Structure formats: C-alpha cells, structure tokens
Amino acid sequence: MYAIVMAGGKQYKVQEGATITVDLLAAEAGSEYVLDKVLMIGGGEAKIGAPYVAGAAVTCQVAGHVKGKKIVVFHKRRRKDSHKKQGHRQGYTQLKVTGIQA
C-alpha cells in the first residue's frame, strides 16, 4: 500500500517504512507527526481525493533535522569594487513513515 501526501506544498509518494525528507517542520526529533493531506491511496482499490481523501492520514516518526547542500549567493556591482558573498543551507526534516490509515 502506498499514499501520495502533500507536505510543505510538495507531493511525496510514501510507503510504510520509507524515509522522506521534507522542508523544515516545527517538530521535535523522536516525536510523532501526522500528515493529513492525503491526495491518493493506492495498492489494491485506489482512492483518489478531491482534493484530499476523507479520513485518511499518514503517521510518521520524526527521525531528525538535517541541512541541505550549501549554496553561495554572490552579488557584484560592476566597476564599483563592491560585492557581497552570502551562503545558505536549507533546513530539512526527515520523516520515517510508520503507518497509513485509509
């Protein structure tokens, strides 16, 4: 059984036991997190939501918080001997799927 869920404006295909990386959530590591925006449940008889499947939820365990690859933002003003270099690392939350309720 699999489900397509929405988290942070993005869609993810999840199965029980899978680990997904979503944008940073305000949840403690080790706590339980419920994704209730389920767009579709597949495997056997498929259920498609309009826009969400009623009564469906995906429960996850928060595995931890990680940072993505570093990107460099460089602004240069030509002929002015002026520039600004700034780095950024996006925060992500890793979720381990523990159950899918249809």
Curated annotation (Swiss-Prot):
Keyword annotations: Ribonucleoprotein, Ribosomal protein, RNA-binding, rRNA-binding
Superkingdom of source: Bacteria
Family matches, as InterPro entries: bL21-like, bL21-like_sf, Ribosomal_bL21
GO biological process: translation
GO CC terms of this entry: cytoplasm; ribonucleoprotein complex; ribosome
GO-annotated molecular function: rRNA binding; structural constituent of ribosome
Entries under HAMAP family matching the protein: Ribosomal_bL21 (MF_01363)
Family per record: Belongs to the bacterial ribosomal protein bL21 family.
Protein role: This protein binds to 23S rRNA in the presence of protein L20.
Self-association state and partner proteins as the record states: Part of the 50S ribosomal subunit. Contacts protein L20.
Protein's name in the database: Large ribosomal subunit protein bL21
Species this chain originates from: Solidesulfovibrio magneticus (strain ATCC 700980 / DSM 13731 / RS-1) (Desulfovibrio magneticus)
